[in-house]
């Protein structure tokens, strides 16, 4: 199995990418990794070249670049070359912690959209109180959506939850302003009607306040709603931990309590860190394309590689393609 990784993408590249890749190579004997980026910088951290090759390029896509224009003009950028490896059959999948917009553009223009899929979806796995996590799609690939798009998201998310996350008959929920039938705007009502007859385990409408309680294994929404929900969850978690830290450091007594509670608090923090689940998969493409978090450390990169490997090994893309072929046009 071969995975191409944009070694220059992310806040801590290339160090985090290289260290994460070496960790993955040590863990999985069937894995070969191509690191795409500046060879001199990559070699500063590469201490084990077993099953790791370097594809050198001096060019990379910056966070300030306009995504689509950058992908079209910077043909030798590390992210574009990683996607090109997939297109040419030299890699089974690719990963980048770089610009989300640019990776989506590279996925569409270089890797290509799967036949039958109208719009791709960006889908992270989010944490839950019980530790199971849930898949949410879309969180920003398309801010405007049609009913057919969300219908296809539900099918793709269900396949992923079952194949990669090992959930039998995963529960699929539609993110809405209430749980009752008939709630929401015209888009929500149309999608609800379609999902009731879909070949999935549809559990109806779900509210954002219940997401972390694990109300569904797959949560479907348009990209605008999903992005707002995602960032609200992120911001709330960060604010709560910040407030808790402030209170625990406010007095000598509370500092003693903090010392006692530290292991439990760290466990809780890790449990709520969605980067531990891997990256956000870009569903609807001809091959797995994974967006790792921009602030990924080596463990986060390793998690993204593990996730990508599972997608390839469990044949997620061929399964989604097969499901879509059986679905009538709506």
Swiss-Prot record:
Its EC number is 2.3.1.274. Its main location: cytoplasm. Pathway: Lipid metabolism; phospholipid metabolism. Pfam families: FA_synthesis. It is an enzyme of class 2 (transferase). One of its GO terms (biological process) is fatty acid biosynthetic process. GO terms for molecular function: phosphate:acyl-[acyl carrier protein] acyltransferase activity. Keywords: Cytoplasm, Lipid biosynthesis, Lipid metabolism, Phospholipid biosynthesis, Phospholipid metabolism, Transferase. GO terms for cellular component: cytoplasm. InterPro entries: FA_synthesis, Phospholipid_synth_PlsX-like. It catalyses: a fatty acyl-[ACP] + phosphate = an acyl phosphate + holo-[ACP]. It is found in: Cytoplasm. It comes from the Bacteria. Catalyzes the reversible formation of acyl-phosphate (acyl-PO(4)) from acyl-[acyl-carrier-protein] (acyl-ACP). This enzyme utilizes acyl-ACP as fatty acyl donor, but not acyl-CoA. Belongs to the PlsX family. Homodimer. Probably interacts with PlsY. This is Phosphate acyltransferase. It comes from Bacillus cytotoxicus (strain DSM 22905 / CIP 110041 / 391-98 / NVH 391-98). The gene is plsX.
